[in-house]
Amino acid sequence: MHSFQLLGLAALGSLVAAAPSPSRVSDLTERSSSCTFTDAAKASSSASSCSSIVLKDIAVPAGKTLDLSHVKDGTTITFEGTTTFGYKEWKGPLIRLAGKDITVTMAKGAVIDGEGSRWWDGKGTNGGKTKPKFLYAHKLEDSTIKGLNIKNTPVQAISVQANNLHLTDITIDNSDGDSKGGHNTDGFDISESNGVYISGANVKNQDDCIAINSGKNIEFTGGTCSGGHGLSIGSIGGRDDNTVQGVKITDSTVTNSDNGIRIKTIVDETGSVSDVTYSNIKLSGIHKKGIVIQQDYKNGGPTGKPSNGIPIKDVTVDGITGSVDSKATPVYILCGSGSCSDWTWKNVKLSGGKSSSECKNLPSGVSC
């Protein structure tokens, strides 16, 4: 009898050892879960239980955010069909993303349509209707956003505050705003980030194609920008973080825009801009300035009196070619006393327009 008991206990022990622990079963189920949502509220509340998320023909209610900021590490998010948003005057954002090792992508033929003309009044964020920001890519780490097709954002499209984020083959088409009052429709606004890599972007808008306000190790390559204010660093100053370091903007085109490439720092503020490269940028149809680097910026209009609290150093401008309009200025440099230094300036070939006689404090080797 005693021996039978021992055998029974041994068999029971082997069964217990062979069975997976409840936590492991639970982990396996969660890792493999795939969810398709057609309701915005359900997506926002339940996304954290899924490892693969499909957002199909989502209609986000007015005044609400499609909140995908609590997803699990490693989640894949796919937009399918048409994503739309109800109308309300508010600050937004309409979409919020966050997390680690997140992949955001889009099915063929899908679109995220902000229907921005409902808010457009020619004033952007400077008055008139309160307009929601479109997409916050904040607190993303080691993540990828690729292939998004975004249309008609009320104001700024993608706000980035992230570490090691890749944004690939993204289209932002606000061209309807040219005739319907679009304003401040920036493509990518980057701040407080380390490692942002944008490639293959196609942006049509009425403001900066990209605006880097702070951060380091930022790259923009293979982009096409049309209708806006060009490839910008700044405006720098007046924020919690006013340092830009390690920027490469290369192999891109800017057409039918106010400016080509631009660095602007706010007058009488402090900060720094360093280790910046603009290389192989082709310009055409530039209405105001092909290359503009100014230290007198102020919203509402430059002062004409540059300050030197935000030095701009270690800048390479190489291979900026193309043309500007007949009334435009090919190159305009306005630096504070001693605050622009160690620049490399070569292969700048811009035709058209009129040279400026108002350039000031140019670094060695640079000409207007």
From Swiss-Prot:
Family that this chain belongs to: Belongs to the glycosyl hydrolase 28 family.
Record SUPFAM superfamilies: Pectin lyase-like
Gene coding for it: pgaI
Keywords: Cell wall biogenesis/degradation, Disulfide bond, Glycosidase, Hydrolase, Repeat, Secreted, Signal, Zymogen
One GO BP: cell wall organization
Signal peptide: 1-18
Disulfide-bond pairs as recorded: C35-C50, C209-C225, C335-C340, C359-C368
PANTHER family: ENDOPOLYGALACTURONASE B, POLYGALACTURONASE
One Gene Ontology cellular component: extracellular region
Name assigned to this protein: Probable endopolygalacturonase I
Molecular-function GO terms, alphabetical: galacturan 1,4-alpha-galacturonidase activity; polygalacturonase activity
Annotated PbH1 repeat ranges: 162-192, 193-214, 215-235, 244-265, 273-295, 307-328
Localization per Swiss-Prot or TrEMBL: Secreted
SMART domains linked: PbH1
Entry's EC annotation: 3.2.1.15
Superkingdom field: Eukaryota
Known role: Involved in maceration and soft-rotting of plant tissue. Hydrolyzes the 1,4-alpha glycosidic bonds of de-esterified pectate in the smooth region of the plant cell wall.
Active site feature: D207, H229
